[in-house]
Amino acid sequence: MEPSSKKVTGRLMLAVGGAVLGSLQFGYNTGVINAPQKVIEEFYNQTWNHRYGESIPSTTLTTLWSLSVAIFSVGGMIGSFSVGLFVNRFGRRNSMLMMNLLAFVSAVLMGFSKLGKSFEMLILGRFIIGVYCGLTTGFVPMYVGEVSPTALRGALGTLHQLGIVVGILIAQVFGLDSIMGNADLWPLLLSVIFIPALLQCILLPFCPESPRFLLINRNEENRAKSVLKKLRGTADVTRDLQEMKEEGRQMMREKKVTILELFRSPAYRQPILIAVVLQLSQQLSGINAVFYYSTSIFEKAGVQQPVYATIGSGIVNTAFTVVSLFVVERAGRRTLHLIGLAGMAGCAVLMTIALALLEQLPWMSYLSIVAIFGFVAFFEVGPGPIPWFIVAELFSQGPRPAAVAVAGFSNWTSNFIVGMCFQYVEQLCGPYVFIIFTVLLVLFFIFTYFKVPETKGRTFDEIASGFRQGGASQSDKTPEELFHPLGADSQV
């Protein structure tokens, strides 16, 4: 390992910091819609009354509100599937810069929806910011992974998830009645997204383009070398360049990789399966059910001030993402993901017991709070941050954009399904709804144990070569890598 490989330079932190402002936008827009639900529904009612001279029917109101929440995920699906169209043509940094136009348009639509007496403006704004966030969930992990040195790739990749959870926490705090979650200021609450967009537009021109993109996609070796020297803080970047050139040579031997090719080619089939299942393990773990309906869950658990308990879970969320940031390069991705899944399954069982016995034993409300906080904490240890950046690690430069698009689409689709279905399933199953998530978590644990490789400390080309060859040479492996390094199938 080069001495500079663990060096954190100012230019590297500027690049990563500028990029993860997009992650913060994703988190903010995920969490912002929940707190002001009642005042926005009242706005819908007033608008309907203004147009038609009568109160809005309750079924129409429910439909409009569900659309306002769910349209964000629909936009995210479209955006995530379009990642490859932008990053290969315009580059990673320029794609992030261009997409801020969507954030500005969305801010204007949502900010002026009350003035324009138009709930259509709000819904369209939610759709557009959803497209922006879908693109961001592809751009940011890809860019951060490509500018980071191998030894710091996991830690810096976790900053994407940290940006998301900080965004959720800011949305929860800003959404309090006493701040912006009231009848007068909710348009500002939804449109404040123009601030991080503006800040990103100021910072990104000073950030370098991905050196991998410059060398492998554009064949601009001198520019790539110059960028690497600034990012690494050293004049000797020979090893980085050699690794990228080897990846480039491998890419030239491969034909252009389409999304269909990812599923057809034996070399890509296993990594794309891993990428998709890890994304599903994040969204189908039940975490979004907890965040979407945390206030109502705390109310059922008998908490007097549920909104503050929800903010408490947001603080736990942020704190344990920071913990993951410091341990991901020591413990490894696979290990943390397994710990997170197992811990969440245990907390889901506790939550079920607490909610089921709440009427007979009022003190169970305290157990439910502990279970929810534990559920959130274990999520941020592994299933929260790791699926985002491990997708970029599993693929070389050629198939990476297509793989990120497929994985992102899987994430957003499962997010949409949970958001739409949880309320109905919860009404059907009552306190036993989290048993469903427990079963899913156990299945994801089994899959991760047998199929997911450890990517810690390995270059992109080494990881991709492992899948191509069905396993690296035994002499190159650490004891940890010897144990299911590329899944059971690869060890035949």
Swiss-Prot record:
Coiled-coil features, chain-numbered ranges: none
Changes after translation: Phosphorylation at Ser-226 by PKC promotes glucose uptake by increasing cell membrane localization.
InterPro entries given in the database record: Glu_transpt_1, GLUT, MFS_dom, MFS_sugar_transport-like, MFS_trans_sf, Sugar/inositol_transpt, Sugar_transporter_CS
Glycosylation sites: 45
Regions of this protein lying in the Cytoplasmic compartment: 1-11, 88-90, 145-155, 207-271, 329-334, 389-401, 451-492
Extracellular side: 34-66, 113-120, 177-185, 294-306, 356-365, 423-429
Membrane topology: Multi-pass membrane protein
Family affiliation: Belongs to the major facilitator superfamily. Sugar transporter (TC 2.A.1.1) family. Glucose transporter subfamily.
Name of the featured protein: Solute carrier family 2, facilitated glucose transporter member 1
Native source organism of the sequence: Rattus norvegicus (Rat)
